Amino acid sequence: MTKQEYEKAVDTLNAWAKAYYDEDEPLASDEEYDALYHAVLAFEQANPSEISLFSPTKRVGGGVKEGFSKASHIKRMWSMEDIFSLGELDAWLKRGEKENLTFVAEPKFDGASLNLLYENGVLVRAITRGDGVTGEDVTQNARTISSVPKSISYKGLIEIRGEVVIRKDDFELLNMERAKEGEAPLSNPRNAAAGSLRQLDSAVTAKRKLLFIPWGVGEQSLGLKDHSEVMKFVRDLGFERDDFFKILKKDELEAAYNELLANRDSKSVMMDGMVIRVNDLARCEQLGYTVKFPKFMVAFKFPAIEKVTRLKDVALQVGRSGVVTPVGVLDEVNIDGANVKSATLHNFDEIERLGVMKNDYIGIIRSGDVIPKITKVFKDRRDGSEQAIERPKFCPVCGSHLLDEGVFVKCQNLSCRARVVGSIIHYASKKCLNIDGLGDAIVNLLFDKGLIACIKDIYGLKFDDLMSLEGFKEKKVNNLLNAIEASKGAELSRFITGLGCEHIGEVAAKKLASSFGLDWLDASFEELTALEGFGVEMANSLIDFAEVNRDEILALSQIVQPSVTQVQSISNALSGKTVVITGTLSRPRDEIKAELESFGAKVSGSVSKKTDFVLAGEEAGSKLDKANELGVLVIDESEYERLKLEV
């Protein structure tokens, strides 16, 4: 994976995570998310100095939905590390010397995590996981769930955590009722449960027959030694019990996993794996946490489910860069509770690689999403009705002639609706100008109503124009206009990123802003290629982009007035040093990298004889080995903090 591919993968994962956690409308299967997530993780482990501040590997869950108030957990609500094979399980057991410990194994239910706070025996608050520190206060909705006790016999302060799910049968009945009312069916039980829990109207939640299954605790002073004892205590308070709860040794884990997997379909609720956690609570605390996961527990995920269906047609989608992406239209098939009608085909080279044709029978896999992946083509089932999938010559949106670059087929018309809308959505996104409220649906509506036709038009939106739109109230209009106004004066690097020049991501934009400031548009090919990390392709892309769009960029810049942050170097023992960061630290690496650079240090991604020292955290890998081999000084965080004070 290249740096550019990594940055794109981070953007994709964040979009998928937002759709999954915040909107309860997944854009990708669990398998696709997991695969891309682990590719990103592998890149970060190999390139720790390049980790994005927005990387999903450093974040737990999602955000807070508009309409709900924020509430904080007393104890942080962590995410879980996923593993997919016995080899990965063995590696996890060896980390921290867990092999001789006793474990608890239980189902990983596929729903929405919820934290229940009881005080003096009364349910006082119910909070979604959110980002792990704060979530949504859904207390009123939780009180409508029959399996959530309103009061318990224990009078101490305690956080009881679990999964909100919906039984498969109840999910089918719910969709039947929605069909009778002319409403669209819900995609799968997981999203039905999450969406039901986060309804603004508690009466809707009450009708959904949700189920709360506890799996742990947060704040508590029970004084118990084992997780199994804690869960017995919780279930004795009147909470739901599951019949699969095993206390096991290492050698028994595989058999337990296979047993649970074999019973997957017979379970009344959706499962997507088996949770394995150290039983001894004191040992759990000794093992500790990474920035995202507890080290004492892991989710051994089930394999994705595969089914056979037929590819009826291929639809074409156009992105903001003009790339035309083929999407397979399928004979509808139900996979593990979700009705699937489409599958990604990635690009036209992938179609040729698969050798797939219209009307072919294909194998698809998914896990928790409606857009699966095609894994195979059953060519032996062809009956003569198959048709070749032609590479398109004209844009399906604007009709202009397409440029065929091999892997990618592109629309070059800068006025193409798909490109314009996509570019505005990108510009307004969190990593760019961060214009809250200017998402996909709103941008499409504004474009259709003729209120915007380019990025600059965002800043010409008027109160009266927005008030005339369906669904827009005074508060919503003011919030949007305030967010647009607040985007003025944004950092130059964010502004450059928001313009969407091909091959110029966040890192390259920061380099341009810090090197050239407001004169970045005038940088020559020689100046660009002299920058660290800038290649010929990036330089040519930027020069071509600047030449074609100069007038529009300058006009937009006059409105936004992007700011250039001047970094003042603080002289201390770190000034002029070349530093490599490796391993897991107590703070995000981007934060430490920025701090080092403010001291005048250079942060490198690889260890060499020119490296002055390596800052090593937990589980440091090959870079630490290389440092020891070359005799490079290795320091920990406490030594780093001391060096900061040496002027």
UniProtKB/Swiss-Prot annotation:
Organism: Campylobacter concisus (strain 13826)
InterPro entries: BRCT_dom, BRCT_dom_sf, DisA/LigA_HHH, DNA_ligase, DNA_ligase_AS, DNAligase_adenylation, DNAligase_N, Hlx-hairpin-Hlx_DNA-bd_motif
Active-site residues, as the UniProt record annotates them: 108 (n6-amp-lysine intermediate)
Protein name: DNA ligase
CDD domains: BRCT_DNA_ligase_like, LIGANc
Gene this protein is translated from: ligA
Record-stated family: Belongs to the NAD-dependent DNA ligase family. LigA subfamily.
Highest taxon of the lineage: Bacteria
Keyword Metal-binding (UniProt): yes
SMART domains: BRCT, HhH1, LIGANc
